[in-house]
Amino acid sequence: MIQGIIGKKIGMTQIFQEDGKAQPVTLVEAGPCVVVQVKTEKQDGYEAVQLGYGKAKHITSAVKGQCRGFGEFKVLREVDVDDIAAVSVGDQITVSDFKDGEKIDASGVSRGRGFSGVVKRWHFAGGPKTHGQSDRHRAPGSIGSTTTPGRIYKGKHMAGHMGNEAVTIRNLVVLKTDAEKNLLMVKGAIPGGKNTIILIKKTGK
């Protein structure tokens, strides 16, 4: 059985539980995906399948050949598989392969926030708001020592580019699936903004 699926983040909403409490959920339009390549231990050194998702406007000849006539896919991703012998090129993967209450890992690209200061990026407290201070409210303060060590240590928290990086959130719970609309309702938040491509894998697989 294939252990993952590719999808697109639709947005967030909420559903009400039996006790009346509102539960925030993320809607993911997952699949349908098509198996475009099967990788075996003998030929590739490991076992996995490559899935295709979404329709591409423009596609290179190399990718077109790799898709082998099953469609012109916008996204190609590899996922693990339990039994490689049970999978063949052209198989379709849908949300029906996931069950309510199942745990998943969601990977995507986080929203970019540009060049951010230390208060936003690293949650610094900032300087004093009074007692004669000026222009210190969101300043980082001291960033190192003097002659010794005579440099700034690697990894020092400073202002810089924030977001727009690969993020994986583990152990999320699938609350509900909708096979007709290809929707997964996932408890909590998932990386990225609207229409972000999300790779969903079953936890521990």
Curated annotation (Swiss-Prot):
GO terms for cellular component: cytosolic large ribosomal subunit. Pfam families: Ribosomal_L3 (PF00297). GO terms for molecular function: rRNA binding; structural constituent of ribosome. Keywords: Ribonucleoprotein, Ribosomal protein, RNA-binding, rRNA-binding. Residues 126-150 are annotated as: Disordered. Gene3D superfamilies: Translation factors. One of its GO terms (biological process) is translation. Part of the 50S ribosomal subunit. Forms a cluster with proteins L14 and L19. One of the primary rRNA binding proteins, it binds directly near the 3'-end of the 23S rRNA, where it nucleates assembly of the 50S subunit. Belongs to the universal ribosomal protein uL3 family. This is Large ribosomal subunit protein uL3. The gene is rplC.
